[in-house]
Amino acid sequence: MSKVNRDEILDILEGYSREDITVATLGSHTSLHILNGAKQEGFKTAVVCEKGREVPYQRFRVADEFIMVDKFSDIVNDDVQDELRSMNSIIVPHGSFVAYAGLDHIENDFYVPMFGNRDILRWESERDLERKLMEEAGIRIPFKYTDPEEIDRTVMVKFPGARGGRGYFVASSTEEFNEKIDSMLERGWITEDDVKDAHIEEYIAGTNFCIHYFYSIMNDEVELMGMDSRFESNIDGLVRIPARDQLDINLDPSYVITGNHPVAMRESLLPQAFDMGDRMVEAASKIVPPGMNGPFCLQTMCTDNLEIVTFEMSARTDGGTNTFMHGSTYSYLLHGEGMSMGRRVAREIRVAAEQDRLPEIIT
């Protein structure tokens, strides 16, 4: 299977009418503000939607066209791709698109012009590649253990792919690691292949900041668009139980993301945040060309020493951007209007079309 040929994508794009572009996405994750932002910037919109899940897009009136499919993964089917291309569609990727379409399909046989860098999506999904990119950027990341037998302090254990925190757990010893792995296997939460690919890293205690950036090729600038923190089940409920009672409850903590809330960072920490974003863009341009174009997110913890430590990244629109569909504290400072991440993407597309530079932002 050969990779999608960029020249073929550009040929498809060349056949589009610049005055009749449709911004399209999969109906999940962050599609509401992607679609709404596109309409705000004057584009037609289309949503590829699983049957039975169309209500939000109808009731919020964000989609002009609906492509109904039996299951989300059908977005890669030839007939769906044909329909998207017939609308002059530019696809805006998000976490659900990556999960349902699948990286192999996105990289090898999805011939619809896509905003951003389709090659970098694998780098957020595979832990070793993600770590390589963050190391190249020179930002602080947790220490990684290559063998459970090496565990000598509290660690966080994660598994491949974007799972919204599902299956993550904390362990303080090799014995505890093995016990929790066995329990999760019995429950069917993970597979033997997951165990082989388990990512074990130093647990960072601190406060959570998920920092949302946008790198604009049009302006050659990294914009800090907003920040959020996450609601996680069941750990958020457990910590509300008195410590003496927690010990008596036979309930394993889990870290499944169930929601997001906006946050503002201490102002003296912002130089660190900007520096981290700049470093990530510079590193990505070197090792995953054309680079970190468009939205990306660094998921971080800030320690009591006021050091920001990055434990994960998203190389596309992150779910936390749903907290500022009307704009954030930070996007207001830069744009002076209600600028969601979806609208920022659409504006980049609009400016690129007006300046005849669409090939620079499409892969």
Curated annotation (Swiss-Prot):
Associated pathway: Purine metabolism; IMP biosynthesis via de novo pathway; 5-formamido-1-(5-phospho-D-ribosyl)imidazole-4-carboxamide from 5-amino-1-(5-phospho-D-ribosyl)imidazole-4-carboxamide (formate route): step 1/1
Coiled-coil segments: none
Similarity field: Belongs to the phosphohexose mutase family.
Annotated ATP-grasp domain residues: 118-350
A GO term for molecular function: magnesium ion binding
One protein family per Pfam: DUF1297
Protein name in the entry: 5-formaminoimidazole-4-carboxamide-1-(beta)-D-ribofuranosyl 5'-monophosphate synthetase
Signal peptide stretch: none
Enzyme Commission number(s): 6.3.4.23
Function, as annotated: Catalyzes the ATP- and formate-dependent formylation of 5-aminoimidazole-4-carboxamide-1-beta-d-ribofuranosyl 5'-monophosphate (AICAR) to 5-formaminoimidazole-4-carboxamide-1-beta-d-ribofuranosyl 5'-monophosphate (FAICAR) in the absence of folates.
Single GO biological process annotation from the record: 'de novo' IMP biosynthetic process
Needed cofactors: Mg(2+); Mn(2+)
Record-listed 5-amino-1-(5-phospho-beta-D-ribosyl)imidazole-4-carboxamide binding positions: 29, 96, 260
InterPro entries, alphabetized: ATP-grasp, ATP_grasp_subdomain_1, IMP_biosynth_PurP, IMP_biosynth_PurP_C, IMP_biosynth_PurP_N, PreATP-grasp_dom_sf
Keyword vocabulary terms for this entry: ATP-binding, Ligase, Magnesium, Manganese, Metal-binding, Nucleotide-binding, Purine biosynthesis
Family matches, as SUPFAM superfamilies: Glutathione synthetase ATP-binding domain-like, PreATP-grasp domain
